[in-house]
Regions:
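Ribokinase/PfkB-type carbohydrate-kinase core domain
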Residues: 1-5, 64, 70, 93-131
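Substrate-binding N-lobe of the ribokinase-like
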Residues: 3, 17-84, 88-93, 101-106
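Small/polar loops that bind or transfer phosphate-bearing groups
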Residues: 8, 47-48, 124
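A short alpha-helix capping/helix-coil boundary motif
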Residues: 11-14, 37-43, 115-120
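Short N-terminal helix/helix-N-cap motif within the alpha/beta-hydrolase-1
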Residues: 15-16, 130
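Acidic-glycine-rich active-site phosphate/pyrophosphate-binding loop
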Residues: 1-15
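Active-site metal-binding loops of divalent metal-dependent hydrolases
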Residues: 10, 29, 125
């Protein structure tokens, strides 16, 4: 069966309106795309990394609940999952501040077999930062 494989960063977005936290949701550009595909029944798989922390567990659970295969999510021991603060202006445009571990270790993860008819989506973060 044809797969859609997303490769990208995942983080927890804490969204502020009028300088007050309104909600916290998992996110990331490729993350959002692959979750949307999982929700409509696509054979969706996501390659990413999370920490072995509460935020990482929340992210992995969210992926599973939205029909995204998490077999290729790398859980990094002792690493904190990335968090972003999204401050919305009056037009709901976001100004982001990112918090992530300065991890320069290469990503060590299992890769899925990619067939000729599979689709692979690359996120902006991993497109410019392969480590």
């Amino acid at each position: 069966m044809r797969k859609v494989i997303g490769i990208g960063e995942t983080l927890l977005d804490i969204i502020f309106k009028d300088n007050k936290p309104m909600e916290a949701v998992p996110g990331g550009s490729t993350f959002n795309a692959i979750v949307s595909l999982g929700r409509v029944g696509a054979n969706a798989t996501f390659l990413t990394e999370t920490g072995d922390d509460h935020v990482g567990r929340l992210i992995r659970t969210f992926l599973s609940q939205n029909n995204v295969n998490t077999d290729y999510v790398s859980v990094r021991n002792g690493w904190k999952s990335p968090v972003s603060l999204a401050f919305l202006d009056n037009d709901n445009n976001a100004n982001y501040t990112f918090y992530r571990d300065a991890n320069t270790d290469p990503v060590d993860m299992q890769l899925p077999e990619i067939q000729a008819d599979d689709t692979v989506l690359f996120g902006s973060y991993y497109a410019v930062s392969p480590a």
